[in-house]
């Protein structure tokens, strides 16, 4: 029996949505080596899916049909063990993962999976932790985890952990997935990376501030990403999310996004999804 067939027996099945960085500005490098950022997060109604069933023996077990997904170093397992340790819970969890989001794509796959795990286990283990506490634990797993825990589109500052809820337009997006995994560490260590963008002080963020400071470095290092940006740029403004590899463009309706997708996905992998300011994970949690 496959992991996905097993998931049908899960106590709770939840989505782990993708995110886009609608803009990403790098303000400088901190003494600890991390970079000060300003970015705008919005969710997509598309993502991974995870199933959860409580175990009585305290074991954390992850099953997936996707080859190459590590166990002990996987953020899902790390999140579960961190919450187990911090809460003192003696219960365990069987977890199933249906992976749709690419690894190294800049759309938050691993971070979103970790956040969904924290919220699911908090619910099933009946821990009663609030979002603030879960987000604080999430930050120890990755800078993008807190925004997924909170589930609202946000303007993020610091290393991405200082979040201000925002409500940008919710268009349809075509997301292209170049078949290359971009190393975030490699991009942020590149000597030619822009690191001196002046901070945005106006709220809400002006529409013209949609630049991604990582784009030039990623295009230079990864011709596959440059090609995807060029092709999509024939139809709409093409943007890079995070450090890539995924690129995206906004469309006023699904029909237009589907039309361009049909043309471009003959040679490139991609998907069409609706932008959402409230994550589909939180919409589902609200009805539990």
Curated annotation (Swiss-Prot):
ATP binds at residues 102-112. Its EC number is 2.7.1.148. One of its GO terms (biological process) is isopentenyl diphosphate biosynthetic process, methylerythritol 4-phosphate pathway. SUPFAM superfamilies: GHMP Kinase, C-terminal domain, Ribosomal protein S5 domain 2-like. The active site is at 19, 144. Keywords: ATP-binding, Isoprene biosynthesis, Kinase, Nucleotide-binding, Transferase. It catalyses: 4-CDP-2-C-methyl-D-erythritol + ATP = 4-CDP-2-C-methyl-D-erythritol 2-phosphate + ADP + H(+). Belongs to the GHMP kinase family. IspE subfamily. Catalyzes the phosphorylation of the position 2 hydroxy group of 4-diphosphocytidyl-2C-methyl-D-erythritol. NCBIfam families: ispE. PANTHER family: 4-DIPHOSPHOCYTIDYL-2-C-METHYL-D-ERYTHRITOL KINASE, CHLOROPLASTIC. This is 4-diphosphocytidyl-2-C-methyl-D-erythritol kinase. It comes from Pseudomonas savastanoi pv. phaseolicola (strain 1448A / Race 6) (Pseudomonas syringae pv. phaseolicola (strain 1448A / Race 6)).
């Amino acid at each position: 029996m496959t992991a996905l067939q097993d998931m049908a027996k899960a106590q709770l099945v939840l989505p782990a949505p993708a995110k886009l960085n609608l803009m990403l500005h790098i303000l400088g490098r901190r003494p600890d080596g991390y970079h000060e950022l300003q970015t705008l997060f919005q969710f997509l109604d598309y993502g991974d899916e995870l199933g959860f069933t409580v175990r009585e023996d305290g074991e954390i077990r992850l099953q997936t049909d996707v080859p190459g997904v590590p166990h002990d170093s996987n953020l899902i397992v790390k999140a579960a063990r961190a919450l187990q340790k911090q809460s003192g819970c003696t219960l365990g969890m069987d977890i199933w993962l249906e992976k749709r989001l690419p690894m190294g794509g800049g759309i938050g796959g691993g971070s979103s999976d970790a956040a969904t795990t924290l919220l699911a286990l908090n619910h099933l283990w009946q821990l009663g932790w609030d979002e603030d506490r879960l987000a604080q634990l999430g930050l120890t797993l990755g800078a993008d985890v807190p925004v997924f825990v909170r589930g609202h589109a946000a303007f993020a500052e610091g290393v991405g952990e200082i979040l201000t809820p925002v409500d940008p337009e919710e268009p349809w997006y075509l997301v292209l997935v170049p078949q290359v995994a971009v190393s975030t560490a490699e991009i942020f260590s590149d000597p030619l990376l822009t690191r001196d963008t002046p901070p945005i002080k106006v709220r809400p963020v002006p529409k013209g501030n949609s630049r991604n400071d990582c784009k030039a470095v990623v295009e230079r290092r990864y011709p596959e990403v440059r090609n995807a940006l060029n092709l999509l740029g024939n139809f709409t403004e093409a943007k890079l999310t995070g450090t890539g590899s995924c690129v995206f463009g906004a469309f006023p309706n699904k029909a237009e996004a589907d039309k361009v997708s049909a043309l471009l996905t003959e040679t490139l992998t991609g998907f069409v999804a609706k932008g959402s300011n409230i994550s589909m994970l939180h919409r589902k949690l609200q009805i539990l």
